[in-house]
Amino acid sequence: MSKHAEAVTLRLAQPDEHKALEELQRRASLELDDYREQLLANPDAIHLPPSQIANGQVIVAELHGEIAGFAALVGGELDGLFVEPDLWGGGIGRALIDAAAHEARRKGLALTVTANPTARGFYESCGFTFEGETPTRFGPGLRMSR
């Protein structure tokens, strides 16, 4: 196991965590070069729909009582995966993906994602297969499945 994964607790997000989750999403999104300029110019693009939390579609990773990351799963689509940047490489993202994959399988679905180019190696290391490029709001995204 990775350095943080064994200490992580996974649970569903609560409505009162919406703002904290969006702030985490903003920090993680702006850490990468892929779409930083577009995201800074279009702050509305960093958004976690409250309905995803209300519908039980957001899995939170907690480390020592603090939110360390989250995954949003809509059907079989990994709609978002965000981990605090200073915790990257510690196994939290992988733990969230495993939980999302388990939930998708429980529904009889494959887990799919439209990833940013920087994340391709990470997703491949988590068992995803590249299927091709797809257009996104800010440029090509990578369609992957597991």
Where are the predicted features?
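A short helix-loop-beta-strand connector motif used in the catalytic cores of GNAT acetyltransferases and
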Residues: P49-V60, E77
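Conserved N-terminal entry element of GNAT/NAT acetyltransferase domains
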Residues: M1-D16
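Conserved GNAT-fold acetyl-CoA-binding loop/helix
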Residues: H18, E22-L48
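Conserved beta-strand in the GNAT
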Residues: V60, E66-F82
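Conserved acetyl-CoA pyrophosphate-binding loop and the N-cap/start of the following alpha-helix
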Residues: L87, G91-A99
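Conserved active-site alpha-helix within GNAT-family acetyltransferase domains
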Residues: R94, N116-G141
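Conserved GNAT acetyl-CoA-binding A-motif
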Residues: A104-N116
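Residue-level recognition of the GNAT/N-acetyltransferase active site
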Residues: D79, E84-W88, N116
